[in-house]
Every structure is written in structure tokens, then in C-alpha cells.
Amino acid sequence: MNLIKIIKKFLFIQNITASIVAKIPPYLEFTVGKYLAIKKALYITAHDKTFGSYIEFGIFTGSSFNFAMKANKSIDKLLGRSDCDFIGFDSFEGFGEVKSTDNHPRFKDDTFAVDEKKVIKNIKKNSKDQKYQIIKGFYNNTLLKKPSEYGIKKARVIMIDCDLKEASMLALNFVRDVLQKGTIILFDDYIFYKGDEKKGEYGAFEEFKAKNPSIKFRPAFEYGYGSKAFIVTEI
């Protein structure tokens, strides 16, 4: 029996599969995709011995930050200790003042404000022996400092989950001097704003590249629902 005949005979299996997949919440798929992307970035950088800090902008509930620490511990056992430290930035109060150019119906303070104490308590519980620090505050304050003031020497993996262009631009400018060949940057909301090239994380990245032509990037992989990763190839 050839493959086409098998497919025709067991059409009900396709129908069942389609029904199951259709009911999986998009947020669940998005989250799993994000986890796998972080794990992939940590593995690639460990494999190529690109050492430094894991930096996350927009930790929200801390789920991906916690996952990064767990994934790194697993990869360390496989490829050897990387001495990676983890730094997370978030206001825990939402976006604060949002420029009109960053307006989006889904990006509202009441959606992204979280209980800071609960988040930090959960991160502490999951950190085990991993080195980490959480920097609270709006980016227009916390990211005016130099990375060295937070103990950051080089960036290994950067997760930009800022949603807005202004916040993403502040994050990119902050890490400018700690980028190295092999650093992987993950843009978690790369495709939003209906693909507008001047808005959101995409717009911030395009502007950053234009202002820093000496830094070269190569697409690494895509993940989730319109998220994308890039690797620094020249600096």
C-alpha cells in the first residue's frame, strides 16, 4: 500500500490531529517556542565557546528567565561549565509612558504589570547555584548606566522582549559595547505592528543597524509566532 492510499484510508486520523492542534492555545505554543529558542541560543553559544552574560529585557513573570537558568545548567553538564551569569531588566509596572508611535491595542500597562515580590521569589527558588541579578526600574533610568556597572563584561545571549520600539532601542544601545562575535540576540515580538518596518522591535533593530554599520548580523533562526534570532558575525 503506497503512502497516498494510506493517507486516504486513515483520513480520520488527520481529522483528529487537526482538531487537537487547532485547540492548542497559541500562547502555549508561543511559550514553548520561546523556551526552545533560548535553549538553542545557549547551546550554540556554548558549543562555539561564546561566553558571557545572558541578558533579558522584559522578564515579566520570570518564566523564560527561570527556563534560561535551567537550560544552561543542563547544557553545562553536556558541554562543560560556561560560568554564565543572568541579568534581567523589568519595571514590573508595565510600560509607563508610551509614545504615540508605540501605541498598540495589546501593549497596555494593566496587561504587563506584575507582582515583583512573587516574581523574584520564584526566580530565587529556581536559581539553584546560578548567578543572577534582577534590575528593577524603567529602562530610561536603569539603562542609562553602563553594562559594567551591573558587572556585565560580554553578552552571550540577549533576549529582547520589550514589545515597543523605544524600549527595544534603549536595550540595544545599552548592550552595544558588550556585543561580541557570536552573541545571539532574540527578538520575541519581531513581526508585530502589522510588519511596519519603523515600529516595534523590528523598527528598533533596523535603526540600530543603520547607526552601527560596523556591526554585522546574520539571521540565525525563527521561532514562535513571528519571533526571530540573529547572531553577531562581525564587530
Regions found by a protein language model. Give the residues of each.
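Aromatic- and histidine-enriched alpha-helix N-cap/loop-to-helix transition segments
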Residues: G33-L36, S63
